Amino acid sequence: RRLYEPSAKYGEVYPLIYSMTVCPQCLYTGFTQDFRVIEKPIAERLLEAMNERYSAVKGLFGYIDFNTARTLHAGAASYYLALLCYDHFDSKYSPTIKQAICALRAAWLFSTLGEKEPEENYTYISKLFYQKALFLYRRALELETTGKEMIAGLKSFGPDVDKNYGYDGVIYLCALLEYKYGQKQNQHERLQKLDELK
């Protein structure tokens, strides 16, 4: 995770909050390359799920206006919305790895929100997003190895906006998330999963 020093002129800077493109009307959210070129069946599914997206954001933050300058709250909400939107995409768009990247970035932003607003449950929500990222990174690797969903066509594997650690970075992140947020009850199963990611 890349952290930025606050500047005297602009204060705290969070470039991560601007990465997702959000339609302020229907709350469709995605990476820029997926935002403009949507096939009609996907657009119809996204439109049908519009109210679910409104409810999801309202449940976390209340009302967020995506017509104004992005805030930390709006940035975190945008990654959550992208997670919901990529559920409706076909496998040729590699939605699982994109959801994994969004879940990890959402975890980072919710963690920052938790530091700024400790009275809220953002730290707990951050841990949930880390666990979701673990599941999605693991699932993306499974789908890649079985040939059901390719991730090699992605321009940037992230995880941050200015770093591209490639396919090896995906494997590394999966192992790191497994180590930090994977189940800890069954040690044999835990060691087996970590060994698979070597």
Residue ranges and their predicted role:
Residues R1-S7, K40-L60, K116-A133, Q185-D195:
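Short coil/linker segments at helix-helix boundaries
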Residues R1-M50:
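N-terminal cysteine/histidine-rich coordination modules
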Residues T29-S55, V161, G166-C174, Q192-L197:
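A short, hydrophobic/aromatic-rich structural module that often spans a beta strand
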Residues A49-L83, K92-P118, Q131, R138, ...:
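Amphipathic alpha-helical repeat scaffolds of TPR domains
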Residues P118-K198:
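Charged, long alpha-helical assembly modules
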Residues I17-Y18, V37-K40, L46-N51, T71, ...:
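Aromatic-enriched hydrophobic runs in primary sequence
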